[in-house]
Amino acid sequence: MRAFVLRARSAPTDSQLFLASVGQEAHTEILAHTLMNTIFVAQSHRNDVVVYLVLESTHDFSRTICFDTRNICHIGGFHEQALLTKIAKALDISRGMTKEQTRVVDEGITVSTISFEKLVQDLAVDYQLFMMDKKGTSIREQEFVGNPCFLLTDHIPMPKKSFNTLKRLGAQKISLGPKMLFASQCVVLIHNELDINQ
C-alpha cells in the first residue's frame, strides 16, 4: 500500500468556508487536485492507495479525511467540483465530533478529529515515512521497502518543529528534483517512479 498525507494548514474545517476558499488565499483547490492525481488513472482508479487530507484551520480540532481506494465505489466524478463536494460532505459529517473520533462518510471514506502529528505517529507503525525536500535523496536513488508514506503540504511549508518530530519517527527526506512543485504534481512523479520500479 502507498499512503499520501497532505497537510493543508490553511484549509478551513467549516464546509462553507472550505468551498468559498477555492481560488482564494487558502487555496483549497489544492486538496482536490492532489486527491485527483493520487487516486485516478485513465478510465479507472488505483486500488492500492490511501490518501489523508489534514485540514488545520479550525476552532476546535483538525479534520483528517481518509480516502481508501480499496473500498471506494463511487466518488462522484473525475473533476474538481465532485471532489470538493465530497470533502465538504465529510466536513459536514464531522460537526460536533470530539477529539480523536472517527465517522464514516461513504464507502472507503472516513473523517477523524486527529492532528497531523498523531496521524503520522500512527502511520509510522506500518509505513516507511518520506518528506519532500530539494536537498533530500533523489527518489530515483531511494530504496523503498514495504509500504511507503509520503508527507506533503499545501502552499504553507511544514513548520520546523514538525521536521524534528518527523525525524524522530524515522522520516527520510527525498527529492523529486531541483524545483519546488505543487503537491498535486509531486504525487504524479512519485506514482510514476514507484510504478516503473514495481
Swiss-Prot record:
User: Which Enzyme Commission number(s) are listed?
Assistant: 2.1.1.-
- What is an example of a Pfam family matching this protein? Methyltrn_RNA_2
Write out the GO MF terms.
Answer: S-adenosylmethionine-dependent methyltransferase activity; tRNA methyltransferase activity
| Residues reported to bind S-adenosyl-L-methionine | M132, C186
- Keyword tags: Cytoplasm, Methyltransferase, S-adenosyl-L-methionine, Transferase
The answer to keyword Methyltransferase applying to this record is yes
Where does this protein reside within or beyond the cell? Cytoplasm
Query: A Gene Ontology biological process annotation?
Result: tRNA methylation
Which InterPro entries does this entry report, sorted A to Z? Alpha/beta_knot_MTases, TrmY, tRNA_m1G_MTases_N
One GO location term (cellular component): cytoplasm
UniProt similarity note: Belongs to the methyltransferase superfamily. TrmY family.
The record, for NCBIfam families, names:
PRK02135.1
Q: What is the name of this protein?
A: Putative pseudouridine methyltransferase
